[in-house]
Curated annotation (Swiss-Prot):
Gene Ontology terms describing biological process: carbon fixation; L-methionine salvage from methylthioadenosine
Active site: K85
UniProt superkingdom: Bacteria
Textual note on the cofactor: Binds 1 Mg(2+) ion per subunit.
Pfam families: RuBisCO_large, RuBisCO_large_N
Listed pathway(s): Amino-acid biosynthesis; L-methionine biosynthesis via salvage pathway; L-methionine from S-methyl-5-thio-alpha-D-ribose 1-phosphate: step 3/6
Annotated positions binding substrate: K131, K157, D158, D159, E160, H248, G316, G338, T339
Gene behind the chain: mtnW
Xref: InterPro entries: Diketo-Methiopentyl-P_enolase (IPR017717), RuBisCO (IPR033966), RuBisCO_lsu_C (IPR000685), RuBisCO_lsu_C_sf (IPR036376), RuBisCO_lsu_fd_N (IPR017443), RuBisCO_lsu_N_sf (IPR036422)
Catalyzed reactions: 5-methylsulfanyl-2,3-dioxopentyl phosphate = 2-hydroxy-5-methylsulfanyl-3-oxopent-1-enyl phosphate
Listed EC numbers: 5.3.2.5
Name used for this protein in its record: 2,3-diketo-5-methylthiopentyl-1-phosphate enolase
Keyword presence, Repeat: no
Task performed by this protein: Catalyzes the enolization of 2,3-diketo-5-methylthiopentyl-1-phosphate (DK-MTP-1-P) into 2-hydroxy-3-keto-5-methylthiopentenyl-1-phosphate (HK-MTPenyl-1-P).
Length: 386
């Protein structure tokens, strides 16, 4: 079996030459007469340039085919092969990676499992982020959770910045919030997921994740790009960690934002996350607060859903843009809001209710024009943020 990778080069770069350099340099490493006696042995490991196309802007996309036998069915060896040292060679960007269906680690829970655990099948899920990100005590987290959970929230997560800090140690946050989750379940019959941020050194992370699950965590959050894809793979493959893992995109810009270098966002936040075992992946929405290419966003959405991974467009999501989100995503999406819920003029519970009012108006085909909105949480949100 083979792995296909697309590299995009600016007009000033000799794409044919660079593609051949990658095909040989990132596989056998050399292909000279000195090694002719090993030709048959080396041939099976050699990459091959299989096509080059020119785009309208003069850029060229070279497609290189790599033997799958060169890698270990994981993301680390894959990235080392397809871009490794060549990532330091100058202009040239990985814009597509096409892997066999069986490559890597599949989501353990995914879209279907998350919906089953919540008992919600016919609408988008609504998710919040604890805010302020830092400075809240463990009990503060529980108080906020109680307010938004009883308003109907499906999922809440730690802010990615919230590590295992003295102000609110991870296990204390979980202990306080777990009581609220049980209270909500007993009084309403509803389950709410709390994605606890797993942090620490590599030799501690898996043990900490197991302990969190053992002590009642029903979801985990991981900053995959700062801790490494190998950590995600280890957590996703661990039978003792039987909860959904929400993958955060922190640091993705350092890998992907360059126009002619690095890897495309759809490769890192789509293909790699989907083949490393994430159950849900957060990433910026094009109409949110961070600049993001709508084409890349669409690719990420489709790549994730093809492998039963929940897309979670984020950063600036607010009730007033729910029609646009659903127009792009349909119902299989998680609406993830931080300030769009926590900074609602009437409080976080009203922030949650505003999202559900938005979903109800879309279902009914009603207008979002403030002049046509009844007084309530949604109208307040739209007047505040548009």
């Amino acid at each position: 079996m083979t792995i296909i990778v697309d590299y995009r080069f600016p007009p000033a770069i000799n794409a044919e030459k660079q593609a051949k350099t990658i095909a040989i340099g990132q596989t056998a490493g050399t292909w000279s007469e000195r090694h002719s006696h090993r030709q048959e042995q080396l041939q099976q490991h050699l990459g091959e340039v299989v096509g080059i196309r020119e785009e309208a802007d003069g850029y060229k996309v070279a497609r290189v085919r790599f033997p799958q036998i060169n890698v270990e069915n994981d993301i680390a060896s894959l990235l080392t092969m397809i871009f490794g040292k060549y990532s330091m060679a100058g202009a040239g960007k990985v814009v597509g990676v096409y892997l066999p269906e069986t490559y890597g680690t599949k989501a353990k829970v995914g879209i279907t499992g998350i919906r089953q655990r919540l008992g919600v099948y016919d609408r988008p899920l609504v998710m919040a982020i604890f805010k302020p990100a830092l400075g809240l005590s463990a009990q503060d987290h529980a108080d906020i959770l109680r307010e938004v959970a009883f308003a109907g929230l499906d999922v809440i997560k730690d802010d990615e910045i919230m590590a295992d800090l003295p102000v609110a140690p991870t296990h204390e946050r979980l202990d306080c919030c777990r009581l609220v989750l049980e209270e909500v379940r007993q009084q309403t019959g509803r389950n709410v997921l709390y994605a606890v941020n797993v942090t620490g050194k590599a030799d501690e992370l898996q043990r900490k994740a197991r302990l969190l699950v053992k002590h009642g965590a029903n979801a985990l959050l991981l900053n995959v790009l700062t801790y490494g894809f190998s950590v995600l793979e280890a957590l996703a493959s661990d039978p003792a960690i039987d909860v959904p893992i929400f993958a955060h995109p922190a640091f993705a810009g350092a890998m992907c934002a360059g126009s002619d270098t690095g890897l495309a966002y759809s490769v890192v936040l789509g293909t790699m996350m989907a083949h490393a075992g994430a159950d849900a992946v957060l990433y910026p929405a094009a109409y949110g607060s961070l600049p993001f290419d709508p084409q890349e966003e669409g690719k990420i959405r489709d790549i994730l859903r093809d492998r039963n991974v929940f897309p979670v467009p984020s950063a600036g999501i607010r009730p007033g843009i729910v029609p646009q989100v659903l127009g792009d995503y349909g119902r299989n999406v998680i609406l993830n809001a931080g300030t769009g819920i926590m900074d609602h003029p009437s409080g976080p519970a009203s922030g949650v209710r505003a999202f559900f009012e938005a979903l109800a108006r879309i279902e009914a085909g009603d207008s979002f024009d403030p002049a046509n909105l009844p007084e309530g949480a949604l109208k307040q949100a739209i007047l505040e943020w548009g």
